[in-house]
From Swiss-Prot:
GO cellular component assignments: periplasmic space
Keywords: Bacterial flagellum biogenesis, Periplasm, Signal
Protein name as annotated: Flagella basal body P-ring formation protein FlgA
Name of the encoding gene: flgA
Native species: Yersinia enterocolitica
Signal peptide: 1-26
Family statement drawn from the similarity comment of this UniProt entry: Belongs to the FlgA family.
Amino acid sequence: MNRNGVITCALGGLLLSQAATHQAMAADLSVQVNQFFQQQYPDKESQVKVVIKTPQNQWPQCDMPEITLPANARPWGNISLSVRCDGVRRFIQTQVQVSGHYAVAARQLAAGEKMTLQDIKMKQGRLDTLPPGALLEPNFAQGAVSLRQINAGQPLTRNMLRRLWIIKAGQDVQVLALGEGFNVNSNGKAMNNAAIQDNVRVRMASGQIVSGTVADDGTVHILL
């Protein structure tokens, strides 16, 4: 083989090596970005799929990229993700698809109706396609009043509902401490407004401050 042939082979080998290295790092970044978003949804019921929309040749290349979400970023949908490599920060455009449970109306509700647990149904589906403020659990809707007509099967959102304070700050409340095999009743004074299933702080007669959950009947439950 002549000298030119040797140089050509060496150059070709170098380019192949660089391409392989880039592909490996790109694959690593894709895995790391997916793992980053998986950690945002630790519950086993949520399924996360991340599509990186930025062309692969524009991805930063380093072994340990520092990945962060911008402040006030939505947890799904189109997200501009900050990736810092060797002190240089780039933004990678991603589409985060999340499937999980969300709350829908179990029946048609008229404006002004108070919702009970029987009016709420949990459904499995894509969370990133839901309207803003969609409810991922029923607690917020329980005991709330609908601000407009809600159709059966319609996803529930925060701006559809007005929560009713079942406990108001300064109100005397009954506190029920629930232990294994025993219950203890006592009284205290609520320190904040709270709706059903909200957390509320209570100052007891002794001066001690405890936190509990508001039950349907307005009592405060504390698990021991």
